[in-house]
């Protein structure tokens, strides 16, 4: 089943799960400020698998995707293809674990290729990224976005300004095929990630110890 925890306490979530005989949970999109889910994990009442949030205990497994290298690779291809030097990087949410990892990849790229980079938060929002691009993209050579949705917003801003800048995204979502402009992105295999997460939940429910999976 799918479950959204917004507005609920850890105790309310626990009661809801127990009433439905739920004993294993896969958690996506957890932020550093999500105290409710962090408490749920600490209490160890459920077998938990967290995707892209570095938390491990005896009842919790962490599935880590190499966000840093993936961001590095897609941005490097875009930068080198167009001989860019000045980068506008539109990052995700400030409190996101993946935001830190992807930004780390960008900082490594800037150092390796002797680039300059301006970083602005896009909050994984198409509209916010569009506004950032409208304000800053004109004086940059390339726009690198930490999600495809933000890349779409940035591209729409460039179209509105009638200027060309290469844009790349991250995730490989289906919508990228409908933008009308070619953009680099990196596909995340959500099906394989989710399948592995379910396998890990079953292992925990059968007495396995929590660990990190890359």
Q: Which functions belong to the PLM regions below?
A:
Residues 47-51, 116, 162-170:
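Short hydrophobic/aromatic-enriched beta-strand-loop microsegments
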Residues 1-76, 134-138:
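Alpha-helical recognition/docking segments in bacterial nutrient-uptake
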Residues 3-10, 63-73, 89-111, 115-132, ...:
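Hinge/beta->alpha junction and helix N-cap segments in small-molecule ligand-binding domains
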Residues 135-142, 146-214:
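Flexible loop/turn connectors
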């Amino acid at each position: 089943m799918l479950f959204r925890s917004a507005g609920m306490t850890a105790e309310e979530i626990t009661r809801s799960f127990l009433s439905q005989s739920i004993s294993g949970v896969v958690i996506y999109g957890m932020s550093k400020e999500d105290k409710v889910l962090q408490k749920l994990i600490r209490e160890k009442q459920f077998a938990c698998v967290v995707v892209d949030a570095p938390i491990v205990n005896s009842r919790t497994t962490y599935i880590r995707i190499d966000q840093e290298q993936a961001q590095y690779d897609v941005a490097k291809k875009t930068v080198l293809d167009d001989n860019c030097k000045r980068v506008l990087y539109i990052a995700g949410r400030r409190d996101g674990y993946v935001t830190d990892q992807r930004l780390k990849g960008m900082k490594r790229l800037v150092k390796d290729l002797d680039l300059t980079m301006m970083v602005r938060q896009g909050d994984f929002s198409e509209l916010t990224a569009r506004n950032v691009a409208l304000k800053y993209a004109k004086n940059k050579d390339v726009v690198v976005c930490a999600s495809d949705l933000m890349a779409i917003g940035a591209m729409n801003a460039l179209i509105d300004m009638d200027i060309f800048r290469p844009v790349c995204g991250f995730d490989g979502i289906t919508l990228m095929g409908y933008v009308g402009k070619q953009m680099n992105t990196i596909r995340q295999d959500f099906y394989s990630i989710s399948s592995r997460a379910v396998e890990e939940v079953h292992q925990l429910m059968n007495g396995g110890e929590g660990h990190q999976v890359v």
